[in-house]
Amino acid sequence: MGEFTQKRLVRKLELELFLAKVAPQPKPQAHLEQYTVSEQLAANMLYIAAYTNDDIIGKSVLDLGCGTGRLALGAAFLGAENVVGIDIDRLAIKTARENTTHPHLADKVEWVNGDIDIISGKFDTVVQNPPFGVQTREADRAFLVKALEVGDVVYSLHNHPEADERLIKMLKSSKGFLQVEPSPFMQRFIYKHGGAIQAVYALPMTIPKMFDFHKKVRHDFIIDLYVIRKIANQSTSVSAPRYPTGKHL
């Protein structure tokens, strides 16, 4: 699955090409909201974590709801010290193991089939693409709570609070991302569970028609990447920071 890399700058295109070889979920289940992120979105997410914030290289990384391993393997490829990926879907974990073809990556990645509740211990970084909470209400919240319980920093994908066709077109044309403000609800919820939002990035995401209830051939929408730091002092102010808008990063 490409050349093993560690502790060197990896070009984003090189990362995308690596991630494109990670096979997606062969039999996605609607109730688990198993939507695979594109290699472009995953590369942007991991690039921010690795090179903007130095949260991947040499770190212990946990991928909650890892699916077939795109984020977990990407973190290992970029130079994480060790990676754990967990998913409740047995077939997803089987596919993730099959995706781990490079021996150097296999030595540093562990796959776990089970509910996220079984995870304990401490990790430097958590990356996750949790269920959006459409099929099972508030499903994403359990992932956030667990991530903040075991991780020092969390990179988590969530639905943008509103549809914005103009922003979607802007993001798709630039193939990049924009820094935006967090939703008030997310800010309160994250603080309640011991975290503070460092930044929020809007990224474009596309879901093809996968299930019977999907009405469109493809659905373009915005996904928000939340970068969250665990805080020791709950009295820390988490009033919404003023993020720059209209700027491609």
Q: What annotation goes with each model-predicted range?
A:
Residues 111-224:
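S-adenosylmethionine
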